[in-house]
Each structure stands twice: as structure tokens, then as C-alpha cells.
Regions:
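N-terminal active-site segment of His-dependent metallophosphoesterases
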Residues: 1-52, 68-76, 86, 168
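Structural motif
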Residues: 3, 30, 96-98, 118
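Active-site metal-binding loops of divalent metal-dependent hydrolases
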Residues: 7-10, 35-37, 58-61, 103-105, ...
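Glycine-rich phosphate-binding loop signature in dinucleotide/nucleotide-binding domains
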Residues: 23-27, 93, 113-114
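Residue-level marker for the onset of beta-strands and adjacent loop->beta junctions
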Residues: 42, 86-87, 126, 151
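Helix-adjacent hinge/juxtasegments
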Residues: 50-99
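Conserved beta-sheet core of the metallophosphoesterase superfamily
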Residues: 54, 97, 103-166
Length: 168
């Protein structure tokens, strides 16, 4: 299964549309969002994805109540709060144990525990990936293009491989 991973929309709906089209072209079946919708209208658009979406809040998600309300009508949209993937909110996609947080300073220690197969984070607006034992730590970069080239990522659960992709 292919998972599309994105972060830091910062209300850039044009780039979000590009990201969603790219995910469709690449055959993504589920999405992981690592925080910073910023406004409810960005969350609303992401909630229109045709498959499951796993999402967390970021530091720039000001009106969390409004964001929660606009995604509440989509039973396939799972908004975990600050992080997802612990024992109470286990995220397993195609047998891969996943943790999602906005913050890399939490994600890297979580990746080092060995409890997860993949840990995804955002916040820095810089795409990166590294391995800690058998666990992948991946930051897809930013959709918004605020600090550089907009990027997203794909994760293939069958191959346990990932790819960073630039948006045009």
C-alpha cells in the first residue's frame, strides 16, 4: 500500500491541490498529515480526500475546535490531537506501526525506541529521512513553500521504502 505524507499546509490551497493530485497519480490509498493546517478551510479540503486520513495538530493550528468540527463529518478522517500512535491510539496501516507528531524533537526519540516501523513529523519545513535501527524517521517537508521548495513524501508499506517528492 502507498501512503501519502504531507505537512505544513499553512493555508496554501493551490499547493495542497497539487499534492493531492500527485498522491492520486502515485496511487496513494491513505494519507498522513503531520500538522499545521493553520485554518479550518485547509482541513476541510484535506478531509475531502477519498481515503483514510490520519492527522495531528501543529503549532500554528490556532482554532483547533473549528478544525475538529470541519473534519468531524468524515468518518475516514482521524484527528489524533498532538500525536498519534501510542498504545491508546495505535496506528497500524497494512501491518506497519506508525507514529505521527508535528515535532521532530519528539519524533526522533520515538523512532529510537524501536517500537515503531515509521515515525512521521513536520514543523521544520525541511524534508529529511533517516533510519534508527529498523525504524524510519521521515519529515515530508512543507506543502506551503514558505521556506523553500514544496515537498511531500510517499511510503510503500510492502517495500518499507520512502520517497521525497517536489511539488511543481
Amino acid at each position: 500500500m502507498i501512503i501519502g505524507i504531507l505537512s505544513d499546509i499553512h493555508d496554501n490551497l493551490n499547493k495542497l491541490e497539487q499534492a493531492l493530485r500527485l498522491f492520486e497519480e502515485k496511487g496513494a490509498q491513505e494519507l498522513v498529515f503531520c500538522g499545521d493546517f493553520c485554518s479550518p478551510f485547509s482541513a476541510r479540503r484535506l478531509a475531502q480526500w477519498n481515503g483514510p486520513v490520519h492527522a495531528v495538530f501543529g503549532n500554528n493550528d490556532g482554532d483547533r475546535f473549528a478544525i475538529s468540527r470541519v473534519v468531524a463529518d468524515n468518518p475516514k478522517f482521524r484527528l489524533y490531537g498532538e500525536y498519534g500512535g501510542d498504545e491508546q491510539q495505535l496506528i497500524s496501516i497494512d501491518g506497519i506501526r506508525i507514529c505521527i507528531t508535528h515535532y521532530p524533537f519528539y519524533a526522533v526519540p520515538l523512532a529510537r525506541t524501536g517500537w515503531f516501523d515509521a515515525v512521521f513529523a513536520g514543523h521544520t519545513h525541511k524534508a529529511e529521512k533517516q533510519r534508527f535501527g529498523s525504524c524510519l524517521f521521515l519529515n515530508p517537508g512543507e506543502v506551503a513553500g514558505v521556506f523553500g521548495t514544496p515537498t511531500v513524501a510517499l511510503y510503500d508499506t510492502a517495500l518499507r521504502s520512502s520517497e521525497l517528492l517536489e511539488l511543481g
